[in-house]
Amino acid sequence: VVGEVDEAWRVNTLENIRLPVRLGQDVFSKGYLEQETIQQTEEAFLRFKHVADNYGVQRMRAVATSAAREASNGSLLIERVMSASGIEIEIISGEEEARLIHLAVVHALNLKNKRTMLIDIGGGSVEVTISTGQNIISTESYNMGTVRLLEKLDTRNNSKHPFGKLVREYAEAARYRIERDIGAEKIQVCAATGGNVEEIGRLRQKLFKGDSDRFVTLDELAELIARLDRLSYEERIRK
């Protein structure tokens, strides 16, 4: 993302680019990054560097999350990208990842004095943050991202176990920690982030003919899960 900050610290997005480099598909199944994947990452960062130079970017930050944290050759990825593009990647913790996401959501939504649960669903991990306004109460990082689960549960190789059932078992293992952090006080806002969440929003709009892809009710979410659970991996991709 390339942005411009004004005197009031408002951010105007100038360009938003997303390139598909699947680090997690290597790391969560093999424990390391293949040379081809590292090369794809180098090429992506060369593209980012070109865009940044065109805009005259003065400050830049690049961060990597769970896949780079866990890859046995994660340091090689950092070195290769730095050598190719001059961009230094910072490998951040799950807690720092959650903090940055919280900052972004607070900036985008009016969360003043509201007790909020933020759920970021990434490829390798899920971060759950409880906050009140701008103050973070607790943050937990769970190793149950979408790419990790697909690799571990072997969905693409026709696993005999229903995908939805196995995912629910993973989620149930984390449930008591989330309920502990929430406590007795009611959650007023639940906000989810990540590419998969955006797809859920678009799918909800398509199936239920809604006006917006930004809001999903609990009943709609339950129906979406039930429908997706009945589909094969290939059918989910086509959806």
Spans of features found by a protein language model:
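Helical "lid/coupling" subdomains associated with nucleotide-phosphate turnover
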Residues: 4-7, 26-59, 65-115, 130-239
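Acidic, divalent-metal-coordinating active-site segment for phosphoryl/phosphodiester hydrolysis
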Residues: 124-130
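Early-domain small/polar-rich strand-loop-helix modules and first-structured segments
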Residues: 1-18
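Catalytic nucleophile loop
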Residues: 98, 123-124
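Conserved catalytic-loop position in the HRD/HxD motif
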Residues: 120
